[in-house]
């Protein structure tokens, strides 16, 4: 309907209504006339339904009997099918619970511990506490460190966490003497095993020992000990120093 034109009911010709509706043939109806048309349509439907019921009552009794018997037979079949489904589900449930549990696999820890403690690289087993050398690319000098732990990523690349060893004045320039080195700082980032070169095996607590690796003069006489030197130079004769005191 164009904008600005007032609608007009096709039945009562009124121009005012709270609600406008369209009929089955597209005519415009007001709210009162649309209710009257719906009640009239309902009455026609009731008449049609009554006529259909009266026509259906002319059927013979044999037809109703046949339909009732077929419904009863269908009901019996559905009950039997439900019982069969219930029995099948019960069988499945029983067999599921009666299934034997899978045999547990025995985990052997003989080789697992060795893999955690040792790392094979270039045909050599590395372990925690080993002393390795690292060559600096800038100055070409060799630095020594002690292995603190091992790391292996998802691509099987092996790395090692290092603790640097600081040389002293008595440390040799061409080789490595563990008794002349002291423990240094721990490195935060691990280094790949390809950058490391094996030097020697050593206990993990060797450089953290509270007692000095160098021979010291005891403050009180001690018996039952055998004195020997640890450093690269001959030790001081302890017996002579004790005799002088």
UniProtKB/Swiss-Prot annotation:
Coiled coil: none annotated. A zinc finger (GATA-type) spans 9-33. Residues 71-80 have a biased composition (Polar residues). One of its GO terms (biological process) is chromatin organization. Residues 39-70 have a biased composition (Low complexity). Component of some chromatin complex recruited to chromatin sites methylated 'Lys-4' of histone H3 (H3K4me), with a preference for trimethylated form (H3K4me3). This is GATA zinc finger domain-containing protein 1. It comes from Xenopus laevis (African clawed frog). The lineage of its organism: Eukaryota, Metazoa, Chordata, Craniata, Vertebrata. The gene is gatad1.
């Amino acid at each position: 309907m164009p904008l600005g034109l007032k609608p007009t009911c096709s039945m009562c010709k009124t121009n005012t209504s709270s609600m406008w509706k369209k009929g089955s043939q597209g005519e415009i109806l007001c709210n009162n006339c649309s209710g009257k048309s719906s009640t009239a349509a309902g009455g026609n439907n009731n008449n049609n339904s009554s006529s259909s019921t009266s026509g259906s009552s002319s059927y013979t009794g044999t037809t109703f009997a046949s339909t009732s018997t077929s419904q009863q037979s269908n009901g019996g079949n559905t009950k039997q099918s439900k019982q069969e489904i219930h029995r099948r589900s019960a069988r499945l449930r029983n067999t599921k619970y009666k299934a034997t549990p899978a045999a547990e696999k025995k985990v052997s820890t003989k080789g697992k511990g060795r893999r955690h403690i040792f790392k094979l690289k270039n045909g050599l087993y590395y372990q925690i506490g080993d002393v390795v050398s690292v060559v600096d690319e800038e100055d070409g000098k060799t630095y020594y460190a002690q292995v603190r732990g091992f790391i292996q990523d998802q691509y099987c690349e092996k790395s090692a966490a290092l603790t640097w060893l600081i040389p002293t004045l008595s440390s040799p320039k061409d080789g490595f003497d563990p008794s002349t080195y002291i423990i240094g700082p721990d490195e935060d980032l691990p280094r790949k095993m390809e950058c490391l070169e094996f030097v020697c095996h050593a206990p993990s607590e060797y450089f953290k020992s509270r007692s000095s690796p160098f021979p010291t003069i005891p403050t009180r006489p001690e018996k039952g000990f055998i004195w020997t030197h640890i450093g690269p130079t001959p030790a001081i004769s302890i017996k002579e120093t004790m005799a002088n005191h």
